[in-house]
Structures are given as structure tokens and as C-alpha cells.
UniProtKB/Swiss-Prot annotation:
The lineage of its organism: Eukaryota, Metazoa, Ecdysozoa, Arthropoda, Hexapoda. This is Putative N(4)-(beta-N-acetylglucosaminyl)-L-asparaginase GM21137. It catalyses: N(4)-(beta-N-acetyl-D-glucosaminyl)-L-asparagine + H2O = N-acetyl-beta-D-glucosaminylamine + L-aspartate + H(+). It comes from Drosophila sechellia. GO terms for cellular component: lysosome. Substrate binds at R271, V272, G273, D274, T294, G295, D296, G297. The active site is at T243 (nucleophile). Heterotetramer of two alpha and two beta chains arranged as a dimer of alpha/beta heterodimers. GO terms for biological process: protein deglycosylation; proteolysis. Its EC number is 3.5.1.26. It comes from the Eukaryota. Disulfide bonds join C97-C102, C196-C212, C354-C381.
């Protein structure tokens, strides 16, 4: 009898414990995503704890390119949670900017090179497969981001460049047409009338500060190398070199990132910037998140800031801090530049950092916006006093 009583009490005890555990599970709050505001100069972050349902799906892009974000968000919402739409959203969003000639720094008719021609760079990266499709120095084809998608989907290559990229585009059904407009021609004519100032040449003769060339190499003593690194001749600024960089994430944490640009104004023909370079202009990894960059591509591409930001998030840094780390690596070596980074983790937390401007605007669409899902946000950039004591990463 005592044995049966002990057994019954033991069963009741186990049942009570199990019930308590289940009750605790069922009544515990829904997990939230830590995303506290960062007080560091030049960074911004999601300012309140949000659940996954409130953050995803999402679209985020550089600058106040609203129409591109609105279209990408509309496409993402065509399926529940944005599933299987992230690539479409990024490509069509960037394509919208190409058609609108956003700030004259994306798409045709902007940033003429030294010969007066506009060329295009673009990239698409799949965070699930790590596959990339990119084009650089694309001539006579308006749909750069869509050609990049064809490189991704129809070749085993990562990037095609120049006239060969244009021939590939023709083979894929894209039509050739001039990328020069009356506005871009006038920009070029005015530049040449002002002795081609400013330009990107150095260590050549005749003096590139007062002439248009043609130039020949000028021997440079080793003692001049440090001096020649200065970039005072050509200031890259807000209206000189904007890139649309866009990230889309669905509710299953599938990520695509993309970029499109017409490059630096009055660039030397053949120049390619950071936008089509994986890890520089953009980087995406479903296991971690994604980042996109904009600014002085000649400087930024040397440091792969988008990759650095993603790897910082992999190491546990929140997106805002990860974005700042990407810029700090550059600042350790080069302080005369302008640039910005957006970083987003796989759960939809995001942050941005910038340098060389007063502030950096970017567009976000997500459920967190409630009755205003598409919104413009800004981050104040690292100020002059913050330029010192940059730590090595």
C-alpha cells in the first residue's frame, strides 16, 4: 500500500512539474530582437525592441530614393512574407532608379566620363547561394541591374565588363541605345570648357590642374609618393557619386542585395568603382545579414566595407556598430573621402553610419512602420572632431 502511495505521489509531482513548465512556455513573452539605439557619432539603429513579425519582410536602400523603395516594397508584398520575391524586389527597385536617373548618378544620362560617355555598373547578390551577377563599364545598355541579373542566372561567371558585357546583353535581348542625353552632353561641354577641371589624373604632364591633356607619365621621386596620395584635387560629394544600394529580406530570412550607379563624374574611361564589386558595393549572407555602401568608390573598394560590416555582425556586433566598423577601417588609412554604409542583420535590425557629410538619408519599408511602412530616416555623420583617434580593427 505504501509503495503504491509513493508511486502515486511521484506521478503527481511529475505532472505538476510538467504543467508548470508548459505554463511558463505558453505565458512567456514573444522573443524580441535587441536593437538598442547607438549613441556613437555617425550611427543609427532601430530604436526599440521589435519582434520578427514587426521587422520582416523589409526593404532598405541608400539615399532618399523613395520611388525605388516603394516599388520594391510593393513587389515584396506580392507574396506572404515576401517569400521568393527578394530578388525581384531588389532588381526592380534599382531598375526604377535607373529609369528615373536618380540624382543623375544612377542610370543613363549622368556622370559623363572624360569622353562624354555614360557607362553603368551594377550587381545582384544572393545571400542563400552566395552567387553574384555583376556588370561594369556597361556601354549603350540602359538596364544595368537587369543585365547583372542575367549574368547571375544565365552564366557561371560573377562579372562581365565593357563592350563584351554589352554584347552579352544584346544576346540576352537587351537593345543598344545611347546613354548620352542633352543634359549629360552639356555637363561634359562645360567641364571641357573649364580646362577639364577637376579630374582624376596625377603624376602626368602637362599639368592636369590646368589642362585637358592628352597626358604622359611624369617620373615621380620616391619622396613624393606620400604627397601624391592626397585627394584634394577632386572632392567626391553628395551629388557627384551616389549609388543606389538596396537590401530585401523575407520572413524566412532570405536576403538579396543589389547596387546600380553610373560612377564618378568625369572619370577616366575604363574606371570601375565599388558598386559592382562583391564585398565593396554590397554583400549578403543569409546566415548573418547584408550591407550596402555608397560614396567615394575608388577609396571604399580597397577596404571591402560591406564585407567588413557583415563579418562584424557575424562576430556579434549590432548593425549600427558593424556599419561604423566598416568605415573605421577606411578612416585608419584615408580621411579625405565621403561614404556611408547600411547594415542589416538577418532578423531585420538595421543601422547606418556615414562620414564626410552632415547627414545621410536612407529609405526603409517594413511592418514596423505600421500605418507608414515606407519611411525616410537619417543619420548624422561622424563630425570633424570624431576624425581623430580612429582605432585599428
Amino acid at each position: 500500500m505504501r509503495t503504491h502511495l509513493r508511486a502515486s505521489l511521484w506521478v503527481l509531482c511529475l505532472a505538476s512539474t510538467a504543467f508548470s513548465i508548459l505554463a511558463a512556455v505558453n505565458t512567456s513573452p514573444k522573443p524580441t530582437l535587441a536593437s538598442a539605439f547607438s549613441g556613437k557619432a555617425g550611427t543609427t539603429a532601430v530604436k526599440a525592441n521589435k519582434t520578427t513579425d514587426e521587422l520582416l519582410p523589409m526593404v532598405i536602400n541608400t539615399w532618399n530614393f523613395t520611388a525605388a523603395n516603394v516599388l520594391a516594397w510593393r513587389i515584396l508584398k506580392q507574396s506572404k512574407g515576401g517569400l521568393r520575391q527578394t530578388r525581384n524586389a531588389v532588381v526592380e527597385g534599382c531598375s526604377k532608379c535607373e529609369k528615373l536617373q536618380c540624382d543623375r548618378t544612377v542610370g543613363y544620362g549622368g556622370s559623363p566620363d572624360e569622353l562624354g560617355e555614360t557607362t553603368l555598373d551594377a550587381m545582384v547578390m544572393d545571400g542563400a547561394t552566395m552567387d553574384v551577377g555583376a556588370v561594369a563599364g556597361l556601354r549603350r545598355i540602359k538596364d544595368a541591374i537587369k543585365v547583372a541579373r542575367h549574368v547571375l542566372e544565365h552564366t557561371q561567371h560573377t562579372m562581365l565588363v565593357g563592350d563584351a558585357a554589352s554584347a552579352f546583353a544584346n544576346a540576352m535581348g537587351f537593345e543598344s541605345e545611347s546613354l548620352v542625353t542633352p543634359e549629360s552632353k552639356d555637363m561634359w561641354l562645360q567641364w571641357t570648357a573649364e580646362n577639364c577641371q577637376p579630374n582624376f589624373w596625377k603624376n602626368v604632364h602637362p599639368d592636369p590642374k590646368v589642362s585637358c591633356g592628352p597626358y604622359k607619365p611624369r617620373p615621380t621621386p620616391l619622396t613624393r609618393w606620400k604627397e601624391d596620395r592626397a585627394r584634394n584635387e577632386y572632392e567626391i560629394g553628395r551629388k557627384n557619386h551616389d549609388t543606389i544600394g538596396m537590401i530585401a529580406i523575407d520572413v524566412e530570412n532570405n536576403i538579396h542585395a543589389g547596387t546600380s550607379t553610373n560612377g564618378a563624374n568625369h572619370k577616366i574611361p575604363g574606371r570601375v568603382g565599388d558598386s559592382p564589386i562583391p564585398g565593396a558595393g554590397a554583400y549578403a549572407d543569409n546566415e548573418v545579414g547584408a550591407a550596402v555602401a555608397t560614396g567615394d568608390g575608388d577609396v571604399m573598394m580597397r577596404f571591402l566595407p560591406s564585407l567588413l560590416a557583415v563579418e562584424a555582425m557575424r562576430a556579434g556586433k549590432p548593425p549600427a556598430e558593424a556599419a561604423q566598423k566598416g568605415l573605421r577601417r577606411i578612416l585608419k588609412h584615408q580621411k579625405d573621402f565621403m561614404g556611408a554604409l547600411i547594415a542589416v542583420d538577418r532578423l531585420g535590425n538595421y543601422g547606418a553610419a556615414c562620414y564626410g557629410l552632415a547627414e545621410f538619408p536612407f529609405m526603409v519599408s517594413s511592418p514596423a512602420g505600421a500605418d507608414r511602412p515606407t519611411r525616410l530616416e537619417t543619420v548624422k555623420c561622424i563630425a570633424g572632431q570624431d576624425k581623430v583617434n580612429i582605432v585599428a580593427l
